[in-house]
Amino acid sequence: NGKPSETPTHHPHLNTSSFEEELILYTTTMFTSRRSFFAMCGAIVFPGVSLGEIIRTPWQGEGPFYPDRIPEDTDNDLVKNGHSTIEAGGKILNLMGSLINSDSKPIKGMTVEIWQTDMNGVYRHMGSFGSKMRDDQFQGFGRSITDKNGHFSFRTIIPVEYPGRTPHIHLKLLNESENVLTTQLYIQGHPLNKKDFLFKQMTKAEQNINSMKLIKNNSTEYETSTILVV
């Protein structure tokens, strides 16, 4: 705990030069069927557009609630804070992703950061609304380092709404200290998306790219996948 987390080593190490082939093989190890994988791609690739034509992930604002104090525990499991054995409240979400460049080549060794509110809509930030309701078991911030195939993962909770915003997860991509990308991930089809001022600033294509399709993988946990293109 406390260190950025490498993606778990059970992901396949593929030598194929075809991004489409690698993505299918990788993602089908995370989901129960190829049908689940292609359903997931609906949140990433536009209908009728090949993987080779996907566009860059859109930039979105960092917002005011990037942690004012980075917690001691910054690993990729946000559901457990530090050495606590008690899990945070909320519905668990396994977020898995791939980082590629505009030529569809995987990018390794990059730091992916995420931060979000707890189940009560409270950030780990002194200025957050409702700080007295903060779930101290929720880490609220985490890091994962992309492996040689560009893969990263987080264990967190499904984001919730709070006044003025639809549910979302903040994401930042760093190459050492250089900020390569800042964006936000949304829940596909959430009714508040159409009212959210930041979501509405994106084109339909960008909304698709930044929307997470949630799949229930057992009685208590969900999973989703995303592709970051820089």
Model-derived segments and spans:
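N-terminal amphipathic/basic-hydrophobic helices that include classical n-h-c signal peptides
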Residues: 1-28
